[in-house]
Amino acid sequence: MPKYYCDYCKSYLTHDTMSVRKSHLQGRNHIKFYCDYYEAKAKETNIWNPSSIPYEITLEKLNRYSDAKKSNGSSEDNMDIDKKENSSDHNKGNVVNHSDAGNDNDDDDDEMIFLPPPPNLSGLPLPPPAVYNNQKEYQKAILRQTLTKS
């Protein structure tokens, strides 16, 4: 049985089966070697410019949560779900009147936040408006079902 050779890792796999290949390709070392290879190729062709990386992680971004916690002066853990449920501050936008859960009122549109549609591809027409309206209706139906079951 032929062995699979990985050019990035410069090694042979013991078996040539799809499961072994898949687990190798998802492995930490393979991904590291893969990234290093293309980074080196980008540096060779002068494409690599570390100052233009759009998703650069800085200490400011990493410490944003701890700075916000210090500025609030609270020692409670903001990630604690139980405390958020008891707090009325955090649930203002999430509270839905259970008596209106069965009605088809559009008053709860203000409480739900919808993302804008993705931009269309150039040369192609926009999707039909029903796509966006159906998405709102699906979200309302899911919200109603979760509220009636709980």
From Swiss-Prot:
The keyword Nucleus applies. Residues 66-132 are annotated as: Disordered. Component of the spliceosomal U1 snRNP, which is essential for recognition of the pre-mRNA 5' splice-site and the subsequent assembly of the spliceosome. U1-C is directly involved in initial 5' splice-site recognition for both constitutive and regulated alternative splicing. The interaction with the 5' splice-site seems to precede base-pairing between the pre-mRNA and the U1 snRNA. Stimulates commitment or early (E) complex formation by stabilizing the base pairing of the 5' end of the U1 snRNA and the 5' splice-site region. Residues 115-130 have a biased composition (Pro residues). The gene is YHC1. SMART domains: ZnF_U1. Residues 80-92 have a biased composition (Basic and acidic residues). The keyword Glycoprotein does not apply. Its main location: nucleus. PROSITE patterns: ZF_MATRIN. Pfam families: zf-U1. GO terms for cellular component: commitment complex; U1 snRNP; U2-type prespliceosome. A zinc finger (Matrin-type) spans 4-36. GO terms for molecular function: mRNA binding; pre-mRNA 5'-splice site binding; U1 snRNA binding; zinc ion binding. It is found in: Nucleus. This is U1 small nuclear ribonucleoprotein C. InterPro entries: Matrin/U1-C_Znf_C2H2 (IPR000690), Matrin/U1-like-C_Znf_C2H2 (IPR003604), U1-CZ_Znf_C2H2 (IPR013085), U1_snRNP-C (IPR017340), Znf_C2H2_sf (IPR036236).
